[in-house]
Amino acid sequence: MNCKQCDQPTSGKSKYCAAHKAEARAKFNAMCEIERLERASRQDQYQQWIYAMSALAEAAYLATTPQAMVVYETAGLTDIPKENGNSWYVSEGVCGFAWIVIKPATSSFAKWLIKNKIGYKNYYGGWVIPMSYLIPNMTQSMERAESAARCCAKFLRDQNINAYAESRMD
């Protein structure tokens, strides 16, 4: 059997002669090195995104003023306040949580999150980054967490990542 690029006999099971086999191997190794460098660059970029999202989330969280509420004891199962009952002022509004959903979980960014143990699998598909990861010292204010999640989801969409914010009242 002859080489694909010349009339020399092939080397072993290769489709190239010894000279062209070495040349093809060098090209392949160079391609692998370029891919490795691109992957490392992409991973550094993802880490920078996490830092940026953390800063954006904290800024949005602090800039949001939740609607305060007053909680009071009721007379039985009605909305009528209990006479001489206790009442509490809640400056942070309703309690709840917020998170970012990234779909599909097979995207490069989602795989990087999985590898770095950031977030968890979403029940309905995709990958979740909870706001408590990006803002570790946050309160249970749902309005503040929602604001931070929306800001981070927009940042990811600007980076061409399919992401959206979700929340739940506690």
State the predicted function of each range.
Residues 130-170:
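Short, compact, well-ordered microdomains
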Residues 1-11:
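Short Cys/His-rich zinc-binding micro-motifs
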Residues 22-32:
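Contiguous alpha-helical segments
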Residues 122-132:
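Acidic, low-complexity, intrinsically disordered interaction modules
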Residues 12-23:
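Cysteine-rich micro-motifs
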Residues 30-115, 123:
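N-terminal leader/targeting segments
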